[in-house]
Amino acid sequence: MGFSSTVGSVLILTTLLICSVYLYSSVDVVSSKFTNAYSQHAESLQGKMNENLELVEITKLGDDIVLKLSNNGTETLSCEHWTVMYNGTPKAYIANQSYVAPMDTVQISINGSTPCRISLISEYGNKYYYKL
């Protein structure tokens, strides 16, 4: 009777040890992913707060509408990550440079006619609306 209870308790303790090692490794991986996602979210919110685009000028050149925007924020922005919507539909655009440094300007031209509503969604999700 004494031998079988000893073997049973050793077997249960070994099983608990193996399960706890597996559980610890799973929790460690999830915790690492959670921490990484949280830091990315914090960086995104910081970028959103530090971003500020201002419309300087709108001109109509033939079939194109040219927007001149000034980056008055503290973030360097990538024009490739922007979305331009023309009357509520996404529209292809051409920017005269790939990146806009703080206190720099960029020109965006889209094919369209006036009157219209143009919405610019930046890489951090800020929305800027313009009505022509």
UniProtKB/Swiss-Prot annotation:
Taxonomic source organism: Methanococcus voltae
Annotated family: To M.jannaschii FlaF.
Chief localisation class: other
Assigned keywords, A-Z: Acetylation, Archaeal flagellum, Lipoprotein, Signal
Residues with lipid group (S-archaeol cysteine): 19
Stretches that traverse the bilayer: none
Residue numbers bearing the N-acetylcysteine modification: 19
Localization terms from the record: Archaeal flagellum
Signal peptide: 1-18
This protein's GO CC annotations: archaeal-type flagellum
Protein name: Putative flagella-related protein F
